[in-house]
């Protein structure tokens, strides 16, 4: 895990791929978002929905973590360019303690390198190599 639950974590960004290939695995992804929020217990979880651009974001506070799965509203459905998230985080001047990427790993070639610790949760793709940080394999079955 990116953080131990006893650490003061500040805000955590979860960057969720919403490209067309992700739709069928949203239940798995939503479960991972809920587990991350509840287990890490950061000061806030900012979910950024992205495909070839950032399509939306949602900010959740600790009192919402136990129902976060039902509150998630993904938007997008186009290509897959993680660099748009990096640029978005910089333009908004967000200072997260870490970024968790949730994706199937079929990216456009841009790297998605952030200036904070990164964890890549990759669904149903054993061949993906993260551009930075650690990779966790997630299986939808």
Regions inferred by a protein language model and the residue ranges of each:
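Von Willebrand factor
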Residues: 6-64, 72, 84-103, 107, ...
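Acidic, Ser/Thr-rich peripheral helices and adjacent loops at domain boundaries
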Residues: 58-82, 136-141
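VWA/integrin I-like adhesion module and closely mimicked acidic/polar interface patches used
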Residues: 106-141
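Glycine-centered flexibility sites
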Residues: 20, 78-79, 105, 133
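Short, small-residue-biased leader/transition segments that mark boundaries at the very start
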Residues: 1-2
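Short, surface-exposed, polar/charged, turn-prone segments marking secondary-structure boundaries
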Residues: 41-44, 74-78, 127-130
